[in-house]
Amino acid sequence: MSLAPKKTIDDAVVKGKKVLIRVDFNVPVKNGEITNDFRIRSALPTIQKVLKEGGSCILMSHLGRPKGAKMSDPKPAKSVRGYEEAATLRPVAARLSELLGQKVEFAPDCLDAASYAAKLKGGDVLLLENVRFYAEEGSKKEEERDAMAKVLAAYGDVYVSDAFGTAHRDSADMTGIPKVLGAGYAGYLMEKEINYFAQVLNNPPRPLVAIVGGAKVSDKIQLLDNMLGRINYLVIGGAMAYTFQKAQGHAIGISMCEEDKLDLAKSLLKKAQERNVEVLLPVDHVCNKEFQGVDAPLVTKDVEIPEGYMALDIGPKTIKIYEDVIAKCKSTIWNGPMGVFEMPCYSKGTFAVAKAMGNGTQKNGLMSIIGGGDTASAAELSGEAKNMSHVSTGGGASLELLEGKSLPGVTVLTNKE
């Protein structure tokens, strides 16, 4: 577990320095317009801290999944190596400039930006073009990542990482630069992520409930295995619940089920029992014959799902039980929705869990942490995200932490003495 306390931007001397900040500006862009700027706004406190202290910022990010060119490729006459219109960070520079209320310089080639960096004075901001326009950024070969890192590191004096969402990947800009510069500091967003996950994994207020949903048991095996040694209650929802229920001998109709994981489900339930973890599975379901929204889906009377029906959300009795468990806990970690929340008729379970967590946090001081990805989207959609202690910005990164893995992009940062 790489969650030792890290030196943060507050420990770094930034006055008069050029500060390289790896941010996460991987925002949704449609026809050149940013449709959600949450990630840009999330990075502002770290950027503003550097500017206030008299430093300048050199910002690096990826956007989307461009194919990426090689550093050795010849430069095209009128364009940039690896350039893809759909993945340019140019619209982000414009939006960031509005949010900061100052000009943000834009370097159209992240590996040919030395002249831009050289001109920076205290209080200036420079955004480099998409680092993933170069294949070396996330290359499997360390020497290729390091070659790119050396070019980027030469632009600045201090390295700050504020991109928790990509901390589970070894890359030129997440792990390469701090190795070249010999130190790395956590930005405010990264610090918050590390602190909340360290608390829930190492020393949570108890009782602690893990709420785990989503489609497949196979996606969450390591998470369940690791968390069973740390939690008091395990609440299971989403399609993965039906694999557990079939393993217990219940009828699941035509609900999604991983037939080859039934023995695994049994062994996880046995392990929970041995560790005194109370496991809660749905006792009723919201069903339909087809995977589509309907005005009046079937609600089962009990745990059994009738033949020809698939369960697509947890039922009202289950919601009540899950709400009661959340109400008696002091910490919650939630990863994975309870049903097909994108369809309103199957969103009640997911939104009820979000509401119970939001209420508990605001009224009873519950520590509520939401893993990123779908769960964060569901919390946003329910209107409860603002009421949680912490909504993680990293889907893959938060999942790997909950699985007990260390994150390369966190491990590489300088430890607090």
Curated annotation (Swiss-Prot):
Signal sequence segment: none
Substrates-to-products reaction catalysed: (2R)-3-phosphoglycerate + ATP = (2R)-3-phospho-glyceroyl phosphate + ADP
UniProt entry keywords in alphabetical sequence: ATP-binding, Cytoplasm, Glycolysis, Kinase, Magnesium, Metal-binding, Nucleotide-binding, Transferase
Location of the protein in the cell: Cytoplasm
A biological process term (GO) from this entry: glycolytic process
Assigned EC number: 2.7.2.3
Main location: cytoplasm
Positions contributing to CDP binding: G214, D219, G238, G336, F341
Family as reported in the entry's similarity comment: Belongs to the phosphoglycerate kinase family.
Record comment regarding domains: This cytosolic PGK lacks a C-terminal extension of 38 AA which is present in the glycosomal isoenzyme.
Protein name (Swiss-Prot/TrEMBL): Phosphoglycerate kinase, cytosolic
